[in-house]
Amino acid sequence: MKFSPLVDELIQSLRCLPGVGPKSAQRMAFQLLERDRKAGAKLADSLAKAMSDVGHCQSCRTFTEETYCPICVSTKRGHSDIICVVETPADVLAIEAGGHFSGRYFVLLGHLSPLDGVGPEELGLALLEQHLASGDVSELILATNPTVEGDATAHYIADMAKRHELMVSRIAHGVPVGGELEYVDSTTLALSFNGRLPI
């Protein structure tokens, strides 16, 4: 059955969200149109405002409505000499939720992927290089994802940082807390053994 052009456009628009296929998009569209038009209008308004007003921090590249994000302007953290490099703004939120890091961030907004046309320029590495050359950074923590692309990105940035004689470290990878060994893949298990710590 074919829907009206506006309903069909709404369904197709919702499919741009990660993990949303045709059926899920249809259910969402129908929910908003049948039962919750007020929430649909609020969603449309919030989406329009976010798309027009949210940009990237001029220092770390995370999301913000201002020129600089709250972490970069913080008197406690904005002058930290430790920078943690992550792939996405969601990674910043995950680390912040843990509450164990009190330095600054640099958000790559992706990872090196030459086949997809993503090189150092797209990741803002010239800006990161400026931070490293400023003399205000003593340590770089690489928190890219443990994927082939994440590893390649981490190695590229580590080489860049070593030219500035900075301490460079990479977050540990291994068995998650509460995980059972029989369900852990062999690569993760190997990383866990290689990165074991004395107790």
From Swiss-Prot:
Pfam families: RecR_C, RecR_HhH, RecR_ZnF, Toprim_4
Entry-linked SMART domains: TOPRIM
Every Toprim domain range: 81-176
GO biological process: DNA recombination; DNA repair
Zinc finger feature spans (C4-type): 57-72
Function, as annotated: May play a role in DNA repair. It seems to be involved in an RecBC-independent recombinational process of DNA repair. It may act with RecF and RecO.
Name the record gives this protein: Recombination protein RecR
